[in-house]
């Protein structure tokens, strides 16, 4: 086995995870080849690049893991942007979770991390929201990455 072979890696799957792994190996002087069937089929492309630890209603250790991960993202994105000279479109825009009644809102696992929105506030945040949604939580710490950039 040659030194070049030892420092080569093949990654199957060009979604968020595959490309993230490829990036990290590349930064560590590995020769990387990514095989991807169809970028538009990847989960990250479909999920709209959401960074929604709180809006997803995660609990316990998974919530803690999500919060820690989300805190690392801005620094990681900055390194990607510096290395590639391409903006990733990180937006701390917040994510709204609507509720039909206040009881469901108060039982939401990450309720205490959100800003309460009454019906009027909810309509202001999401213009044209169906009137069946009476309450909402705005998770200002959540956001998204523009994952459809090329």
Residue positions per predicted region:
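Beta1/beta-strand and adjacent pyrophosphate-binding region of the FAD-binding site
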Residues: 2-17, 33
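Short beta-strand/turn micro-motifs composed of small residues
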Residues: 13, 36, 99
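Glycine-rich FAD pyrophosphate-binding loop
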Residues: 26-46
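Dinucleotide-binding Rossmann-like beta1-alpha1 core, especially the glycine-rich loop
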Residues: 50-126
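Short, basic/glycine-rich phosphate-binding loops at helix/coil junctions
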Residues: 128-135
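Helical element adjacent to the flavin cofactor pocket in flavoenzyme catalytic cores
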Residues: 137-150
């Amino acid at each position: 086995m040659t030194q070049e072979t030892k420092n080569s890696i093949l990654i199957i799957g060009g979604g968020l995870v595959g490309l993230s792994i490829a990036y990290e190996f590349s930064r560590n002087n590995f020769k990387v080849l990514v095989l991807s069937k169809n970028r538009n089929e990847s989960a990250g492309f479909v999920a709209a690049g959401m960074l929604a630890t709180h809006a997803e209603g995660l609990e316990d250790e998974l919530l803690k893991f999500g919060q820690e991960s989300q805190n690392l993202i801005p620094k990681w994105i900055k390194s990607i942007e510096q290395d590639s000279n391409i903006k990733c479109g990180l937006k701390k825009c917040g994510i709204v979770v609507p509720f039909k009644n206040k009881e469901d809102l108060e039982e939401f696992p990450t309720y205490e991390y959100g800003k309460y929105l009454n019906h009027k506030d909810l309509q202001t945040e999401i213009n044209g929201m169906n009137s069946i949604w009476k309450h909402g939580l705005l998770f200002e710490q959540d956001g998204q990455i523009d994952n459809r950039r090329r």
